[in-house]
Amino acid sequence: MFCCVALSASAVELDSLGRDPNYVKSILKRSEKIVDNLGITAPAVKQNVLYILANRYFKLNDIYEVRDQKVKYAKAVLTGASKQAAIEAAELEKDATLYRCHFEFPASLSLYINDKQIDAIKDGMTYNSLQVQYESLVDMVPSLTEEEKKQIYAWYKEAR
């Protein structure tokens, strides 16, 4: 059992190869601001979590860049229904790719940190939009029951 955990929780490599050094530095700085608030005391764990988070930003950027290139091509070269179909296909491909890697991120983090810390990372990445949107909705619809509020919060959390 320990052998599998040790192999799974090995050092995380930063996916910086071929990336603009200034972009890498910017992503690391953004990621450090989030990771620094988690209370991680072990330097190796902190670095692994930092690299997982930075790699997530890189992966998200890569996915959106592919989509943007396909949309740009469609707008420049195609016309009419073909153009619209290519744009929609690029969006669907982006969504499918995002869905496929959606669970990979918290699973990787869970090797090093607990669920509360994972939620703190997600909140940091989304600028606490979960709480902001939830509180705004509850303020706009004061007639919500506690059960409805719990369900809405669960939906927002899942969407995050």
Spans of model-derived segments:
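Bacterial Sec-dependent N-terminal signal peptides
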Residues: M1-L17
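Charge-rich (acidic/polar
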Residues: V12-R160
